[in-house]
Amino acid sequence: WVQYFDHGFQGPGGWYIEKSLTTLNQKDPVSEHNTELWNTGLEANKDIARKQKRRLHYVSNVLVVSDPTHPENEGQVKLFRYGKKIFEMLKDKMQPQFEDETPMNPFDLWEGADFKIKVRKVDGYWNYDKSEFATPKPLSDDDAKLEAVWNSQHSLKEVIAPDQFKSCLLYTSPSPRD
């Protein structure tokens, strides 16, 4: 998997939806602007900074086993973007917190497990708490199929390649003054 940060908010000039340069360990104009807003100490400025804060995303290659909404995706390797909750579920499988739990790499073609995404709305927000892993098993007994899946993976490096970041953009929101 790879991880990246982005910003997504509506400003006076329209929507700003871009990956954050902090992903590349570089200064990001929106993050710097948010810091300036926050440091004024004004609650109105802090509210603006909160609305513009960076968001964390993860991306992995996944084989779509079942997709009732879009059956044309079944059998294809897709890039799957997800948030902290699903990442924590993956991490808990790979690095269990308790001694009686066996570590498992869900991405392993022979000893991994399908991840069943179960989405529901809780208090107006999408919730993935009911998602779960199936019993670990080989993806297939057919080496040709395993090789085809392996060769169908997308480049994760491209997701966070420098050309995917618009470093020249600087968003400035009007700041309430004291």
Regions of interest found by a model, annotated:
Residues 150-170:
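Accessory, usually C-terminal, subdomains that scaffold auxiliary metal cofactors
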Residues 1-105:
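OB-fold ssDNA-binding interfaces and closely related basic DNA-contact patches used
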Residues 171-178:
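Conserved small/polar residues in nucleotide/adenosyl-binding loops
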Residues 79-147:
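Extended serine/threonine-enriched, polar tracts that run as long, contiguous segments within proteins
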